[in-house]
Amino acid sequence: MEAVLVAMSVPATTEDDGFSLITDKLSYNLTPTSDVEIVTSDNRRIPAHSGVLASASPVLMNIMKKPMRRYRGCGSKRVIKILGVPCDAVSVFIKFLYSSSLTEDEMERYGIHLLALSHVYMVTQLKQRCSKGVVQRLTTENVVDVLQLARLCDAPDVCLRSMRLIHSQFKTVEQTEGWKFIQEHDPFLELDILQFIDDAESRKKRRRRHRKEQDLYMQLSEAMECIEHICTQGCTLVGPSNVVDNNKKSMTAEKSEPCKAFSTCYGLQLLIRHFAVCKRRNNDKGCLRCKRMLQLFRLHSLICDQPDSCRVPLCRQFRKRGEQDKKMGEDTKWKLLVTRVVSAKAMTSLCQSKKNKCEQAQGV
């Protein structure tokens, strides 16, 4: 059966090994001009031109440079055997070498075979297209087979996407024949897959833990702003302790307006009021709520950049204590906490600034 190729023109060049690219329009219908025959698994013979094959594939070029073997019935034509794949896949492969065209139907039918051929014969353009096409057609049924081929064909993108699909649908993939096959015949691949899944789960846990930590630092950053806001301006329940306002009505009106972070601010107000009247604060056993408030006061003192004029209670006292701890080398954990809280505050400010700009742009 004679395959049909799209006609194309090829620029003429001269090679040291004795063969040159053909400058006429090429097609399989012009069998007298062909000087190569591609033999497939079922002995189908596909006529081709050495110049075109050599220009499209460095592997085929090396084959052309070797001394030609004589085969009965082939005359003076060079014979190249491409075995191990369907004959139609070979026809599509040769057609691509001529025309660089590949239909979706051909990709659907022979994508895996074309990926193997493009790797063996080093046809980069075809390999890239096949990699994308094979990835788009991955299913739980074929993913293990595709992964095995991708490893052999040095297709890292296909390997990665296959691994991710196996990870996300592992329970389904476990029931497939492909998985059962590698369990019996390729334990190293099975181990690699399980290792990939384990690493992916570990990364997911680390990301989840990191998000929780970032949320905590964001909350602490918000708490620091609320403490300063409460002790400087006052809020619904608590006002500044060292500011006397003769206009009580205006003071009440100012306090009655809740701040933006009301839930955090309200909780801190309750803590501050408890801290002010708690009798167990100085006991040996102590008070858990008071200890928490003291820790927040200490964190504020380490972040505060205006300790002399700060109205937050115990700010200057903790500042002096922090300097003593620094000399003794006992502030490492607090220093790390301050760094992360300050970073979280900077990120929050940046996000808020971008949000405000977007809102202004939309308003305009």
UniProtKB/Swiss-Prot annotation:
GO biological process terms held by the UniProt record: abscisic acid-activated signaling pathway; auxin-activated signaling pathway; circadian rhythm; embryo sac development; pollen development; protein ubiquitination; regulation of DNA-templated transcription; response to abscisic acid
SMART domains, A to Z: BTB, ZnF_TAZ
Recorded domain comment: The BTB/POZ domain mediates the interaction with some component of ubiquitin ligase complexes.
Pfam family, one: BTB
Residue ranges of every copy of the BTB domain listed in the record: 34-106
Main location: nucleus
Cross-referenced InterPro entries: BT1/2/3/4/5, BTB/POZ_dom, SKP1/BTB/POZ_sf, TAZ_dom_sf, Znf_TAZ
Loss of function: phenotype: Altered response to auxin. Blocked ability of TAC1 to induce telomerase. Hypersensitive response to both sugar and abscisic acid (ABA)-mediated inhibition of germination.
Protein name: BTB/POZ and TAZ domain-containing protein 2
Assembly and binders: Interacts with CUL3A. Interacts with GTE11/BET10 through the BTB domain.
